[in-house]
Amino acid sequence: MVPSLALVPGEPAGIGPELCIRLAQQPRSDAHLIAYADPDTLHSAAKALCLSVRLLDPDQHARLPGDLPLHPVRQAAPTRFGTPDPANAAAVIAGLLGAAGDCLSGKLQGIVTGPVHKAVINAGGIAYTGTTELLAAQAGCPVVMMLANSIVRVALVTTHLPLRAVPEAITAEALARCLRITATAMQRDFGLEHPRIAVLGLNPHAGEDGLLGREELDVIIPVLDQLRSEGMQLIGPLPADTAFLPQKLTDFDAVVAMYHDQGLPVLKYSGFEQAVNITLGLPYPRVAVDHGTALELAGRGVADPSSLLAATALCARLAARS
């Protein structure tokens, strides 16, 4: 069965809408896409790109270039590309939660999301730290943020936290939960029966036997030992500065980093254009672009759709497996 996927552009004033229009120019055989967006915004994006778009009823299938089934999500204010309006924050969140709700009900089999501007959502009066956290709260389940490209997959124990808050957040419970969710996803979603997972230390040189910090000795190593006794293939804790050497990456199926900026700079340097953001642990596949709203590019027709193309292709594969 060909899966039906929600396509949510994110911040309407950013590049998300025009990327969706570009995606609609290439009819797919691997998925049926349904946009959850404001129709006027999509028409404006198509006009800015000098491309055609034909918005269909959500139960219709795209057959021609420019066809895009639409579940309309009306905005409170018109879109001005490059100038976000907090009045539209509720529509952005409604699009995300509506699409995810249809996945939870079984109506859809996955969701592809564009970039969201956190500050604009909060300025609109909605407490929001990220789409990963939003969808986890809706589904009522723990999740893990993983970013991936063709070279490496990186899962995060902590996500959007100030650096000073990270050590306290690295608990045995949090680390074990992240590793279990990551291992299960590698098996279920990526078909790896015995995934090999590298685990980074928190401190420089992975703590150097306690000289540079005790988190490795007190938290990380005991958790790894316990999970190894249960059969998980875990390597580490490894010093982060050498874990990503090309000759080492072939030994791992995924890397678990302790915090956001520990693991993601290397991934983005190695292939930012093709990188995607995967939410592990949800009852449906969710894959997002790995870039921001790029307000300075919006409406100019120069935004690179590579990440959205990669996210859609991966979401279709994951949905077909589930």
UniProtKB/Swiss-Prot annotation:
Name the top EC class: oxidoreductase
Q: In which pathway does it act?
A: Cofactor biosynthesis; pyridoxine 5'-phosphate biosynthesis; pyridoxine 5'-phosphate from D-erythrose 4-phosphate: step 4/5
Annotated disulfide bonds: none
> Binding positions for substrate?
132, 268, 277, 286
Q: Which reaction does it catalyse?
A: 4-(phosphooxy)-L-threonine + NAD(+) = 3-amino-2-oxopropyl phosphate + CO2 + NADH
Q: Which cofactor does it need?
A: Zn(2+); Mg(2+); Co(2+)
Q: Provide an example Pfam family for this protein.
A: PdxA
Q: Which InterPro entries match?
A: PdxA (IPR037510), PdxA_fam (IPR005255)
EC numbers for this chain: 1.1.1.262
Tell me where on the tree of life, at the top rank, the source sits. Bacteria
Report the locations given in the UniProt record.
Answer: Cytoplasm
Amino-acid positions noted as binding a divalent metal cation in the UniProt annotation, renumbered to this chain: 160, 205, 260
> Gene Ontology cellular component?
cytoplasm
Q: Which biological process annotations from GO are given for this protein?
A: pyridoxal phosphate biosynthetic process; pyridoxine biosynthetic process
Protein family per UniProt:
Belongs to the PdxA family.
Other comments on record: The active site is located at the dimer interface.
What does this protein's UniProt record list under function?
Catalyzes the NAD(P)-dependent oxidation of 4-(phosphooxy)-L-threonine (HTP) into 2-amino-3-oxo-4-(phosphooxy)butyric acid which spontaneously decarboxylates to form 3-amino-2-oxopropyl phosphate (AHAP).
Name it.
4-hydroxythreonine-4-phosphate dehydrogenase
Q: Which organism is it from?
A: Xanthomonas campestris pv. campestris (strain ATCC 33913 / DSM 3586 / NCPPB 528 / LMG 568 / P 25)
